[in-house]
């Protein structure tokens, strides 16, 4: 898909209703675009960073979409206040959905300033542009369970205090406070959902779930072809996570942006609310490993302790495939 300049986008859309979505090349943004095309009649404009090349793999489902012509791309940069001002002023979107961010907890320690600029200051740029040029625009910013940090009780709810323990979590928690300030001070429809882990086929391979599923697929292929394979290397397999389906989450986000339609208890005098979105169930990474291999028809078992623990192919499957390497998963301390 071509990235259009803002003037061309304005000329194409004219007076149509618009939803502006950032982070559209990622998992959540691409699912959001597809959801909106399927469920609304809005023109969808996606914001992408000014790069000579960008990843379009998550757009493959849109190639033959009957409403693909109602999805356009234009340049966007969270750290460029003038760019954001122009977009909000010229397009006057009805909704502004922000998934753009520095999203990696580990990287936030090495790039704390950049993380803050993207995840907090960038949100201020958007809110200020909306306040000045399009105050009826509804704004959603993606939050994270990392905002909770050191939790006080389980399960966490909307009233749980925010005690982030990483620069990433702190940047998202600060953004939440900024969103609240603008909502209450300027009467904006501005919210930040608090999202737990949500997965899917568009999840980046740097996340543990995709690392596991891609690894399982690679190992299965190697077993069938009788070729050697590298074990999947993981950190603490006893860590628990709350995982959900990313497609369910974009539906929840749309409902948060339209509470008068979806809240039975809603009336015009009520404050809009921010919500935690989760499955309310936790599972260990170990369980995820077992289920992923089971889905691929590979049986295995755990043995060893601590960093010496391994998940190896079962005797029955070893006889079936006669693998060169029997260790499917091993622990690497660097991933703790």
How would you name each of these model-derived features?
Residues 113-114, 122, 165, 208, ...:
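Alpha-helix boundary/capping detector
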Residues 154, 205-213:
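A glycine/serine/threonine-rich, flexible loop-to-helix segment
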Residues 197, 201-204, 238-241:
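Heptad-repeat alpha-helical coiled-coil signaling segments
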Residues 13, 39-41, 46-47, 76-77, ...:
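C-terminal substrate-binding subdomain of Rossmann-fold SDR/epimerase-dehydratase oxidoreductases
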Residues 1-198, 247, 253-257, 286, ...:
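N-terminal Rossmann-like NAD(P)+-binding domain of SDR-like oxidoreductases, especially those catalyzing
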